[in-house]
Each structure stands twice: as structure tokens, then as C-alpha cells.
């Protein structure tokens, strides 16, 4: 039997789940569909860095709001506010750092420039080749592997429907919205949100939309357990 929703969200990562929660609070009947498990795609296997210093200036208002959301999640997602530094090692890098961070500060980020003495006092193990550094007290990190569990609990608390291990095979339009043929049945929704991240391109192709998306994979190195070398985000 086809079930009808106000909104179907394809992708159960941070963007999909957080959107579903907010819309459910506003009374929309929403379902989240994910080909794997909630929060176990890119949302669950990243380094978890939460730094305002690496955000684009135009996106700073959204970054500030997002940062406050992470802080509100707190211990449930392993949120820690440590403060963070951005470093420059050459004159050219220092020039770019001053230019970029000044713009970010003007956009609302609490970023300041610190002296080498202040940097050394905070992080004694950093290289002495650093020429310039900026600091943001709001920077920190979260444990990305906990986000799926967090959102699963929140979705259940708010009675938001979700389907895991549910592959979307076909999306078609009709007079009242969209039909989604999936491995767990057919879903009809008045509205559709594609939040599939790196998998967005083939999903959008169902609607004859060719998105210019490229996937770039970063790596995280895991070593034997050691004593901490630094306490801030760098």
C-alpha cells in the first residue's frame, strides 16, 4: 500500500534528519529514507571538526547557527568546545590569513589574531616555524559516529517516520507531488527533499537534473593510543 506524506527526504544524514525534525515540529508529516543506516554515510565517518575559521564568509550566518545547534546537542554527540587556531607558515599564507579572517570576523565570527607568545603558551608542541595565527574560542569538535544514534532517538521521540536500508529505485512526478519506488515499498509525497550528499547526483538524475557534483574523499589516520600533543583544534 502506498503511504502519503507531506514531505519525503532522501538521505538520512545530518541535513536530512535535522530538516525532518524541524518540519515535524511545524506539523508536517515527513518520512526519511536512507540506503544505509541513519548518520552512517559522510555524516558519520568524518573527523568531526567544528571550526568557524574554515567557513566561507557568505555562509557565516548559517555556520554560526549550526554551531549553536551542535552545542545544544552537547554530550549526546560528544560536543567539546576547545578553541581553535589557524596557522600560517609563510609570508604569503600570513597575508591570506589576515585578509580572510578579518572578513570572517566582520561577518560575525569571534576570530582574533594572536601573538606567537600567546600561541606558544596555549600549544607548546606547535612548530616554531609558524609566522601568524588566528584564534576562535568557539571552535571545537563532535564525535561524528554518535550522530546517527542521536537522530534515531530524536526522530522516534518526535514520531517522525524513517526507513533504513531503503534504496530509492525510481522517482516520478505526478499531479499531486512525487512517487518514490523504493526497496521498502512505494512512497507518495507532496514535496521532495534530496539530501543524499555524495550520492545526490544519481538520485537527482531521476528527475532529469544533472548536478555538477564531484566527490572528494578526505582521510583520517588512526595511530596507537598516545598522550595528547595539542588541546585545541588546529
Kindly give the residue locations of the regions a language model identified:
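N-terminal Rossmann-like FAD-binding beta1-loop-alpha1 element of flavoenzymes
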Residues: 5-31
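Conserved Rossmann-like nucleotide-cofactor binding loop
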Residues: 15, 38, 199
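Flavin-dependent oxidoreductases
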Residues: 18, 49, 171-234
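Glycine-rich FAD pyrophosphate-binding loop
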Residues: 24-44
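Conserved dinucleotide-binding and phosphotransfer motif residues
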Residues: 26-28, 107, 158
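Short loop/edge segments at beta-strand edges and connector loops
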Residues: 34, 81, 115-116, 164-166, ...
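Dinucleotide-binding Rossmann-like beta1-alpha1 core, especially the glycine-rich loop
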Residues: 47-122
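Helical element adjacent to the flavin cofactor pocket in flavoenzyme catalytic cores
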Residues: 134-191
Amino acid at each position: 500500500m502506498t503511504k502519503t506524506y507531506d514531505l519525503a527526504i532522501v538521505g538520512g544524514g545530518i541535513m536530512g534528519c535535522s530538516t525532518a525534525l524541524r518540519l515535524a515540529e511545524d506539523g508536517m508529516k515527513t518520512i526519511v529514507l536512507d540506503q544505509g543506516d541513519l548518520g552512517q554515510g559522510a555524516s558519520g565517518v568524518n573527523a568531526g571538526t567544528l571550526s568557524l575559521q574554515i567557513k566561507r564568509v557568505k555562509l557565516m550566518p548559517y555556520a554560526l547557527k549550526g554551531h549553536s545547534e551542535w552545542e545544544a546537542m552537547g554530550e549526546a554527540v560528544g560536543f567539546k568546545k576547545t578553541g581553535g587556531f589557524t596557522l600560517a607558515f609563510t609570508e604569503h599564507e600570513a597575508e591570506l590569513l589576515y585578509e580572510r579572517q578579518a572578513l570572517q570576523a566582520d561577518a560575525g565570527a569571534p576570530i582574533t589574531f594572536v601573538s606567537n607568545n600567546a600561541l606558544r603558551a596555549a600549544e607548546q608542541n606547535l612548530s616554531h616555524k609558524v609566522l601568524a595565527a588566528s584564534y576562535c574560542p568557539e571552535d571545537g569538535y563532535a564525535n561524528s559516529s554518535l550522530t546517527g544514534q542521536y537522530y534515531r532517538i530524536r526522530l522516534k521521540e518526535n514520531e517522525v517516520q524513517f526507513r533504513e536500508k531503503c534504496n530509492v529505485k525510481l522517482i516520478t512526478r505526478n499531479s499531486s507531488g512525487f512517487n518514490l519506488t523504493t526497496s521498502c515499498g512505494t512512497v507518495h509525497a507532496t514535496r521532495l527533499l534530496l539530501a543524499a550528499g555524495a550520492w545526490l547526483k544519481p538520485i537527482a538524475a531521476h528527475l532529469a537534473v544533472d548536478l555538477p557534483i564531484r566527490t572528494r574523499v578526505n582521510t583520517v589516520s588512526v595511530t596507537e593510543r598516545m598522550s595528547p600533543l595539542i588541546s585545541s583544534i588546529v
